[in-house]
Amino acid sequence: MKFAIESISKNSGRLGQLRIKDGGPEFKTPLLLQTTKGGSIPWLSADVFETQVSRKPQVLQFTLSTMEQMTEALTHWNSGGGRGLSDYVGLPGHLNILLLRDPCETTPSGGNDRDILPLFTRRGKESLSAERYMEIVASFKPDMYEGLCDADTNLESAKKRVQKSVDRTEKFMHYIYEHRGKVNSTLLAPIVGGYNTFARTQSIKHAREQPAGSYGGYIFEGFHTNGLSATTLDTSELLPIVEHCVKQLEEDKPRILPGAYTPLTILELIQQGIDVFDTSYAYCASLNFKALTFSFVQDAVEHVPFLDITDEAIKEDFNPPLSNCNCLTCQKHTRAYLHHLYKTNELLGPILLMVHNLYHYMDFFEKIRESVAKDTLPQLTELVRNQNGKTQVDYSIAANTKVISKATMEKGFAAAAV
């Protein structure tokens, strides 16, 4: 993996070019990974994603917690001449990264053992050792993969739990570093330690002590428990820790921060020097019946961050979900129609909502890269912060009380309503 910095600004972060595989496409950073569940973009077929969301190659974010059951099949697939993980899930032409935990769902706490990491899958809790993890990585053959780490920490974690997460991660990574040569994939060094600067420094020091070429980048873990918790993080606590960590890292490696961070938090993290994020925020919004409507284009109109499609007030609103959006949903359909799909249990509902949210979020990142290049990210941050209003906009996502379960949501909107 090769990472080259095009420009660095004190006010706007950094702009870079990331090439994951020799001969593969180059990706501009700040980069947005495409979050998947079970190897698929939630609610979207490969054809819909590639024709209605993005026609360009993307980096798919796979998670072991949602794909562990595919290990045996992938072993046979790759040993029989299979063309890799993306081809296996029906998304050829895209590169991929393998993470441990699903950033879209809350990860249960506990279950930690000295030599074992708990992995919460669709079959329940699995015990994952460093040896077993490397066997799985060898079977999956991802383009990039996260080092095994204990990320069971958040803002409320006790000092003892934080220290254990660092010590256990070092033990796991000692084995990973020794055996990484058996896997033809780029390793990402995990940086853990919760909100403790000393613990984070210890984690960084352990990674930087490794021989040159041991890993291709850094991935930050342990700030939250995934799911909606990432949308409510206190940035006054988060940003100083990130700043502390970034100062200790070399410039020529990408920095990845998975999780459903809000648009405003992402902009502030980019100013700190983070390079790669994911689309789990767009998924969480879709799951909770919200269309993203925040503006990132300068105008004089006050905007709101979401459109709640369960709101009875839009049942006769024949405007598009977002007037200046060029996605299929906004070009062909109305707010009233989305509300109708929600009320009538139509599977088309979550499909159209996810198409819009992904399209809008990817457009947002295009604007971010443009702003970083022009060193105007502070102005974009101010717009996203207030949306031309007088107070800061709340981008946090609360679980919709009308949602019963994710399983019913996948069958349509109304099936999930009370």
From Swiss-Prot:
UniProt record, GO biological process: tRNA-guanine transglycosylation
Record's keyword terms, sorted: Cytoplasm, Metal-binding, tRNA processing, Zinc
InterPro entries: QTRTD1, Queuine_tRNA-ribosyltrfase, TGT-like_sf, tRNA_ribo_trans-like
Name of protein: Queuine tRNA-ribosyltransferase accessory subunit 2
Pfam family, one: TGT
Protein residues bound to Zn(2+): 325, 327, 330, 356
Record-level GO cellular component terms: cytoplasm
Gene3D superfamilies attached to this UniProt entry: Queuine tRNA-ribosyltransferase-like
GO molecular function: metal ion binding; tRNA-guanosine(34) queuine transglycosylase activity
Species, as recorded: Drosophila sechellia (Fruit fly)
Its job: Non-catalytic subunit of the queuine tRNA-ribosyltransferase (TGT) that catalyzes the base-exchange of a guanine (G) residue with queuine (Q) at position 34 (anticodon wobble position) in tRNAs with GU(N) anticodons (tRNA-Asp, -Asn, -His and -Tyr), resulting in the hypermodified nucleoside queuosine (7-(((4,5-cis-dihydroxy-2-cyclopenten-1-yl)amino)methyl)-7-deazaguanosine).
Cofactor needs: Zn(2+)
Domain of life: Eukaryota
Record text on cofactor binding: Binds 1 zinc ion per subunit.
Assembly behavior: Heterodimer of a catalytic subunit and an accessory subunit.
Family to which the UniProt record says this protein belongs: Belongs to the queuine tRNA-ribosyltransferase family. QTRT2 subfamily.
Subcellular localization: Cytoplasm
